[in-house]
Amino acid sequence: MEALVYTFLLVGTLGIIFFAIFFREPPKVPSKGKK
């Protein structure tokens, strides 16, 4: 069960860091209607 907790913490931390970077500097991606 510890593996599940560690995975959850890892995903949570990565998500927070990703959001922090995204909100810190606006995404300048020249992708208009391209995904």
Swiss-Prot record:
Entry GO terms, CC? chloroplast thylakoid membrane; photosystem II reaction center
PANTHER family per the UniProt record, alphabetical = PHOTOSYSTEM II REACTION CENTER PROTEIN T, PTHR36411
Transmembrane feature ranges: 3-23
Give any Pfam family that matches: PsbT
InterPro entries with a match to the protein in the record: PSII_PsbT, PSII_PsbT_sf
Going by the UniProt record, its keywords in alphabetical order are: Chloroplast, Membrane, Photosynthesis, Photosystem II, Plastid, Thylakoid, Transmembrane, Transmembrane helix
Q: What HAMAP family does the annotation carry?
A: PSII_PsbT
**Domain of life assignment:** Eukaryota
Per UniProt, what is the membrane topology? Single-pass membrane protein
Which gene name does the record give? psbT
This one is known as Photosystem II reaction center protein T
State the function annotated in the UniProt record.
Found at the monomer-monomer interface of the photosystem II (PS II) dimer, plays a role in assembly and dimerization of PSII. PSII is a light-driven water plastoquinone oxidoreductase, using light energy to abstract electrons from H(2)O, generating a proton gradient subsequently used for ATP formation.
Family, per the entry?
A: Belongs to the PsbT family.
Its localization reads: Plastid, Chloroplast thylakoid membrane
Give the SUPFAM superfamilies listed for this entry: Photosystem II reaction center protein T, PsbT
- Alphabetical GO biological process terms: photosynthesis
Query: What does the annotation say about its assembly with partners?
Result: PSII is composed of 1 copy each of membrane proteins PsbA, PsbB, PsbC, PsbD, PsbE, PsbF, PsbH, PsbI, PsbJ, PsbK, PsbL, PsbM, PsbT, PsbY, PsbZ, Psb30/Ycf12, at least 3 peripheral proteins of the oxygen-evolving complex and a large number of cofactors. It forms dimeric complexes.
